[in-house]
Amino acid sequence: MMRAGGLLKLGVLVSVLFVAVFLAFELLESNMNFNLGKVFTRYAPPDAVPTRPLRHKCGLSKSCPEDHFAFKITSGAASVVGPKMCFQDNVIMSGVKNNIGRGINIALLNGKTGELTKTDSFDMWTGDVNLLIKFLKDIEDGSIVMMATFDDPATKMNDEARNLIADLGSSSISILGFRDNWVFVGGKGIKTKSPFEQHIKNNAETNKYEGWPEVLEMEGCIPIKHD
């Protein structure tokens, strides 16, 4: 009986020792895998490390060619949210910058350097259209002209002002009406109509907001003026 009891104790001791050794090896292997994982992650080649999505200037969907300026322009939303203009990754007009107003908002930039030269807004509901006309006449040749509407852009607009804007490359200025939304990028001295223009009519049946159409957003790449 004593011999049998001793053998039983010995068997239990061997089993416990075996389990302890097994667990020790398991723990060691787990630590080695963890450490090796850290090492391989640290020294992984660049293409194996996740990267952030590439961001383009002004949040454009793709980068502009090297000899172009990037821009994005958004019209106002009803009479609540004003327009926003971005040029070469710099916001040049917005509500936050406090340089926008009801009517037509305009930014002028140097066509060679991209330097912002002037911004202004003209109230076309109760304002004086002659102020807009003078501003348009004073634009220097070679200037990039960005325009965006807010609230009402057309009540005070007359033929002289429309013709001056058409000379900047606009195709839609002749039909711009009460509370229409419109965004445009043209230039002083342009020889053709600008490809950068969007216009949406104020229509009670299709308006997104009560009394106003939906917001317009336009982006693009403007060739740098070299001559």
Curated annotation (Swiss-Prot):
GG-type lectin domain span: 67-225
Lineage: superkingdom: Eukaryota
InterPro entries per UniProt: FAM3 (IPR039220), ILEI/PANDER_dom (IPR039477), ILEI_FAM3C (IPR039475)
Compartments, record wording: Secreted
Record flagged with keyword Disulfide bond: yes
Keywords linked to the UniProt accession: Developmental protein, Disulfide bond, Lectin, Secreted, Signal
PROSITE patterns: GG_LECTIN
Leader peptide range in chain numbering: 1-30
A cellular component annotation (GO) from this entry: extracellular space
Keyword check for Aminoacyl-tRNA synthetase: no
Annotated S-S bridges: 58-86, 64-221
GO molecular function: carbohydrate binding
Similarity comment text for this entry: Belongs to the FAM3 family.
Function: Involved in retinal laminar formation.
Record PANTHER family: UNCHARACTERIZED FAM3
Protein name: Protein FAM3C
Gene (name only): fam3c
